[in-house]
Amino acid sequence: MLIKLLTKVFGSRNDRTLRRMRKVVNIINAMEPEMEKLSDEELKGKTAEFRARLEKGEVLENLIPEAFAVVREASKRVFGMRHFDVQLLGGMVLNERCIAEMRTGEGKTLTATLPAYLNALTGKGVHVVTVNDYLAQRDAENNRPLFEFLGLTVGINLPGMPAPAKREAYAADITYGTNNEYGFDYLRDNMAFSPEERVQRKLHYALVDEVDSILIDEARTPLIISGPVEDSSEMYKRVNKIIPHLIRQEKEDSETFQGEGHFSVDEKSRQVNLTERGLVLIEELLVKEGIMDEGESLYSPANIMLMHHVTAALRAHALFTRDVDYIVKDGEVIIVDEHTGRTMQGRRWSDGLHQAVEAKEGVQIQNENQTLASITFQNYFRLYEKLAGMTGTADTEAFEFSSIYKLDTVVVPTNRPMIRKDLPDLVYMTEAEKIQAIIEDIKERTAKGQPVLVGTISIEKSELVSNELTKAGIKHNVLNAKFHANEAAIVAQAGYPAAVTIATNMAGRGTDIVLGGSWQAEVAALENPTAEQIEKIKADWQVRHDAVLAAGGLHIIGTERHESRRIDNQLRGRSGRQGDAGSSRFYLSMEDALMRIFAPDRVSGMMRKLGMKPGEAIEHPWVTKAIANAQRKVESRNFDIRKQLLEYDDVANDQRRAIYSQRNELLDVSDVSETINSIREDVFKATIDAYIPPQSLEEMWDIPGLQERLKNDFDLDLPIAEWLDKEPELHEETLRERILAQSIEVYQRKEEVVGAEMMRHFEKGVMLQTLDSLWKEHQAAMDYLRQGIHLRGYAQKDPKQEYKRESFSMFAAMLESLKYEVISTLSKVQVRMPEEVEELEQQRRMEAERLAQMQQLSHQDDDSAAAAALAAQTGERKVGRNDPCPCGSGKKYKQCHGRLQ
């Protein structure tokens, strides 16, 4: 009560922020007449003037009023569009490392031009981040004329672009691209082998569009660059045949409970567990298929990989549904983003799950991958010096933005008051009744000329509604991941009178639904439109626009509640843009996933007690409250998962930053010889310590072991035992010095042969490759540690503290291994004398010529052409890989002429 009273008197934090910013808006408005008097050249010249002032030490914040006034005036001249006062407020919020909540249709794209221009003046680059390539390209091309008018360069960063084009895009003042591409470029830059291969500059200012989608919905999904490991596709196929024999165990309180099943499914945590009965059956089936020996247990350490295959296959069959979680297109399993309904081409599930789904669908199984580099969006975006974002729905997640990203959320008021009617939810007993009610509502709305947008949470549901509409004879468009290319065109015309559009989740987000349809899209479809044609199109559009407004504006139908209230609000936000009329309603059933998993059983019990007849709906504040509570439960659970993921990833992130920083330093220097010398001393000291403990008696020394180790690991053949016999005065310290001196001498002789420059280049390459190889193994080890660390809780230990402690000791061990591997590799490298190299090269050329002649004798296309030619020449059978080579060298064929193929 007291807090409410204080807020009434002093205003909320949001009100105080906006009050402070409105004073700056008044200053910008006062500058408008002055800006209007400037010629185009004088307006363009302001950019150079601002940059000069910054170089002299002026603070960026001091330029806000004038810079925003310049952008507003330039926008009027280039686009014929003037920034509203609320857009100026939004621009200031975005410059202050905050999240700006701006409703759909309030012009977020135009608002973004203000902070983008201001922060680009520093010359350090601005990254505008969008959710897909289409929006990145659209926004870049739309805003390019404005920025170029003001003397700034614009770049677009798209997947598949060659490195030089990417470098050029990043060198621009303002770069547009997707969150995935920025993250992958960062990882690729940290795998580069020369400074020239890197494309990104230092990360300065990121302006994230649809910030909730990127920083919250996708926060649990790490970006991973992976490489293939050995082929195990056959095992996935064999295990996949077994899974259909297993029966799912239903809950005991459900109507379909039929005694004990073989596996149970936890839909909340998306996990599958074998029951005891299931374990017995699957072991029998594995033995029958010849995959496992009689009497063996699936849980024995020897079968750990087999258990991995069984779990992956079970999850693929029980938890992942075609046209909901993925689609199959051109013989390929493509993931569908659960948040946007869009396909994620090129993205694959890890831990063998993708291969298990491929086996289930009978498509070609691609190899499993090993992580080479990975980062979460949470940690990538926190690398920027300055981060800001905008969205239509952020207030529900304000706490998360604040606690994880240290970003405050400011709700920017709308330019015109919102008049959309949000109708109460209707709850039905069954899915079929709900779908029927939706069809009736659509018929009623379209009969009076009102356009309808139907939001579904999966492709499967969108196709179910589509089939029912087709049966009812209602014309409609479907907007889901299967029809990616037509997305913008369908959305643009979704505001036509009586138009019906079905959209999965938020597919098509970023394109406004204009009441009456988009006249711009109609003009764009004409080849060379005349002024008369354009006027006629505009006049026709105005008639349609007025008719739709009279019918009640765009009506939104939600076919079920999403896990997050924010995503429901995004769907609602498609209607009622810029003060237009509109309405929305959600239709639910007790069979919906959210209701089934999270709504208490008493809700369905209460509905039964009310004696509801088929087709009847319940509309009660209690039910609405129960649904809101269910959503809150899911949101808080998802927040905890993301928070926990971040706490664990922060440990890996500290190590990642240390490795990448070290790697970049290594890339930027040309001479690493000092580092090599320092490492050599450490490595030899540790190696000798293992066999000659410091300050120990000679009787405790293991000289044969030390000699063998030096020979095997460092190619250093030293007569240490002989030295000790011949030189009694040789003590521990002098012996250490002599071994190190000998290793340096051998290395210097190699350097004299190849030259210092070549040796420095080689040293750098070895260090980079060894670092990458060990870092890759370390990441895999960290993943394994992470998966099992929760079990430490049973021993009354804090899993997070244990993870920190163990990962730190693993990291320290990796750094020691790095030193050892580098010195071992450099010591073992064989350097040929120039004349030896020439002789070997001569032999190689002669063998290549001889092979070429032999290949001319044969016109076979297969890989055994050379072998067949040799067989023909010598009158012998076809030569096997392990047979002696027919050329008479005495070597095996695979090590002689077979190798040259």
Curated annotation (Swiss-Prot):
Q: Which cofactor does it need?
A: Zn(2+)
Its domain of life?
Answer: Bacteria
The family database entries (SMART domains) matched by this protein are listed as: SecA_DEAD, SecA_PP_bind
The entry's free-text remark on the cofactor is: May bind 1 zinc ion per subunit.
Please state where this protein is localized: Cell inner membrane; Cytoplasm
Record lineage: Bacteria, Pseudomonadati, Pseudomonadota, Gammaproteobacteria, Enterobacterales
Catalyses: ATP + H2O + cellular proteinSide 1 = ADP + phosphate + cellular proteinSide 2
Quick one: which residues bind ATP?
87, 105-109, 512
Family, similarity comment: Belongs to the SecA family.
**Name by which UniProt lists this protein:** Protein translocase subunit SecA
Keyword Metal-binding among UniProt keywords:
yes
Residues annotated as binding Zn(2+)? 885, 887, 896-897
Subunit record text = Monomer and homodimer. Part of the essential Sec protein translocation apparatus which comprises SecA, SecYEG and auxiliary proteins SecDF-YajC and YidC.
Task: Name the enzyme's class.
Answer: translocase
Q: Which NCBIfam families match?
A: PRK12904.1, secA
Region spans: Disordered: 859-901
Instruction: Summarize the record's induction comment.
Output: Repressed under conditions of excess protein secretion capacity and derepressed when protein secretion becomes limiting. This is regulated by SecM.
